[in-house]
């Protein structure tokens, strides 16, 4: 477990809805499912990473956060997580 997973977990209320933007290998999603909330999804730009997450049974879709976040209706999530992601945005 990465050190920041515990910190992120402490900020999220139990049984809340969360989206992990740029979820990569899905390890944070897996950690949060096991320790905090079952209702968490991921958005990832890498097709290979998405396939890897799906093979682990994680709810992840392929998309570019700068363009595809709009597909989610307002108030879909209680938390949106950008762990190691914000620096990749062109216009943060």
Report the location of each language-model feature:
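A short, conserved alpha-helix within the catalytic core of class I
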Residues: 89-92
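Short conserved loop adjoining the S-adenosyl-L-methionine
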Residues: 68-74
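Class I SAM-dependent methyltransferase SAM/SAH-binding core
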Residues: 27, 31-68
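Conserved class I S-adenosyl-L-methionine
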Residues: 16-24
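A conserved beta-strand element that flanks and buttresses the S-adenosyl-L-methionine
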Residues: 81
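Conserved alpha-helix/loop element of class I SAM-dependent methyltransferases that forms part
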Residues: 1-15
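Short catalytic micro-motifs in class I SAM-dependent methyltransferases
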Residues: 84-85
């Amino acid at each position: 477990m990465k050190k920041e997973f515990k910190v992120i977990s402490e900020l999220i209320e139990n049984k809340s809805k969360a989206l992990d933007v740029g979820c990569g290998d899905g390890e944070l999603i897996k950690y949060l499912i096991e320790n905090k909330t079952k209702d968490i999804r991921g958005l990832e730009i890498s097709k290979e990473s998405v396939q890897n997450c799906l093979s682990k049974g994680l709810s992840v879709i392929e998309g570019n956060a700068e363009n595809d976040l709009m597909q989610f209706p307002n108030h879909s999530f209680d938390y949106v997580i950008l762990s190691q992601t914000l620096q990749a945005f062109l216009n943060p």
